[in-house]
Design a protein with these regions (language model features):
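Vicinal oxygen chelate
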Residues: 1, 34, 45, 88-127
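N-terminal beta-strand motif that seeds the catalytic metal site of vicinal oxygen chelate
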Residues: 1-16, 74-77
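Exposed loop/turn and edge beta-strand positions of beta-sandwich/beta-sheet ligand-binding modules
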Residues: 4, 40-42, 73, 108
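Core segments of cupin and vicinal oxygen chelate
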Residues: 11-52
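Short amphipathic alpha-helices within nucleic acid-binding modules
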Residues: 21, 85-90
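A short, acidic/glycine-rich surface segment
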Residues: 31-32, 39-41, 61-67, 100
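Short, charged/polar surface micro-motifs in flexible loops or helix N-caps
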Residues: 49-53, 61-62, 84-85
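Mid-chain, well-packed structural core segment of small domains
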Residues: 70, 77-85
Length: 127
């Protein structure tokens, strides 16, 4: 049986820009970074609060993928936060634009969206 989600893999267009975004802006911690010469590709393992959650990959000339929320495939990646207003201020101060706060009609919880450097929709959802 499944125990949970182990990690999410993301292929980025600009490795340096995405690495800075996920570490400096979102605060994920680097677990391991390797360059795979045979693929001319970086693989960056990232954790959040000590839990390994994201693999960030670079590949030479990756094809673009539609990233608007209604495209097939991954719709968005959501992170839980304690205080959405505080997190929005932090993101905005680091140059990240966020959408207006919305209220989930089913749970009454607050959430908003923003995007990573490749346009992947990201969400913060208040606990």
């Amino acid at each position: 049986m499944l125990n949970g989600i182990h990690h999410i893999a993301i292929i980025c267009a600009d490795y340096g820009k995405s690495k800075r975004f996920y570490t400096d802006v979102l605060g994920l911690e680097i677990v391991r970074e390797v360059f795979r010469e045979e693929r001319r590709s970086y693989k960056l393992d990232l954790s959040l609060n000590g839990q390994y959650i994201i693999e960030l990959f670079s590949f030479p000339d990756p094809p673009p993928r539609p990233s608007r929320p209604e495209a097939q495939g991954l719709r968005h990646l959501a992170f839980e936060v304690d205080n959405i207003e505080n997190e929005i201020v932090k993101l905005n101060l680091k140059g990240v634009a966020t959408e207006p706060i919305r209220t989930d009609p089913y749970t009454g919880k607050l959430f908003t969206f923003f995007a990573d450097p490749d346009g992947l929709p990201l969400e913060i959802y208040q606990k």
